[in-house]
Amino acid sequence: MQSLSEYFPRPGLSTPIVTILSPKGEVLEHEQRAAVRYIIQGGRGADILFAAGTTGEWDRMDNRGRQTVSRIVVDECRRASLAIGRRIEAWVGITAHTRAETLANLKYAIELDSDAAVVAPLSVRDASSPPDFVEREVGGLFEKLGRTIPIFLYDNADIAAPGKSPHLHTRDVKRMARLEYVRGVKVTAGKAVLGNYTRAASHFKLSHEFAIYAGDPYLIFDLFAPAEGIAGSLRHRWNRYVTQRSMPYGVVAGPANVLPREWQRAWRVCRAGNGQLIARYGGAVERLRAACTFKRAGKPYVPVIACYKAALKELRVVESDAVARATPSLESAERREFAARVERMVKCNAQELEPGWVSEYDAHPALDRAPGVLRGHG
């Protein structure tokens, strides 16, 4: 098996990219490539792109679709890395509903020479034991192929298979983390669950780095907020207790599909503890969350995937905002209202944020627009 001794998990902003689909559910390659380039922002956007994740509707596509979007993302990240002189990592989501399809996706990720693979063991319906599957079957495939790539675990209660625990057990994570190729976990959960991971990881005593990425991106504005005033000091002490003074290695931000520069800057100012800029960028990204929130039958309705795709269409990055079957969608009136909200959001961000940190789009010729048209400044 290939040694992973030189691999260190990439810190920073990871974006689980949306999958650009036709109304028939087919991956639109030219538009998918445009979306990847937009998210990278010439090096000012995502540090990592995560293909075929939950935001990418992996659970509503077949394996052909998952592998197609993975191929596109890996290729575009490789091209971008060469162009900007800095590596943009491409992580391939390999999770499928069955063990056989999941392993087929892992084999394909290896063939693509992807930087890493991401698996949600609790989402694989016929995998009775997450650590057994990751150790015996994933490890067995590596041994058979004679090649190894880093594996990152994915813990998200929303996609756990029926009858499975909503979250991975700490003892199972500890066992999997001891495997040479398991290098971290993406935790889509609140602060308490994230804290369980950070506290546990401090006692793993591993021979390699094990990174924890916050899958609820808005948590960083709380976790990294400076201890200013009585309330801030109390929050700071509580956060240190909950996380055992161990902060996330990176952030996985679905809304960075729409605001890649803003989220990159948000991560940086949070890490730096700059209270003024934390508040400013927190407000900027909160505008998108508010724009994605509607009411149906008196209850909040938040179709984030449909909104991210609609926003990319409004910014003229893509032409199709179709979602997969069963993905929550926008009604016509909601779609019109959302377009107006996006326009207001873009104008506010252009007025309030630092120069160079408002996302812009250099239109792709495949979309029949002249190159050099910048979008995102209103």
Named regions from a protein language model:
Residues 2-167, 325-330, 347-378:
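Active-site beta->alpha loop and helix N-cap motifs at the rims of alpha/beta catalytic domains
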Residues 95, 112, 196-211, 335-341:
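A short, hydrophobic/aromatic-rich structural module that often spans a beta strand
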Residues 68, 72-80, 108, 112, ...:
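Alpha-helical structural signal in soluble globular domains
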Residues 27, 31-35, 65, 69, ...:
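General structural feature for long, well-ordered alpha-helical segments within catalytic domains
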Residues 41, 229-378:
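Structured C-terminal cap/extension of enzyme domains
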Residues 144-301:
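Catalytic alpha/beta core domains of metabolic enzymes, predominantly
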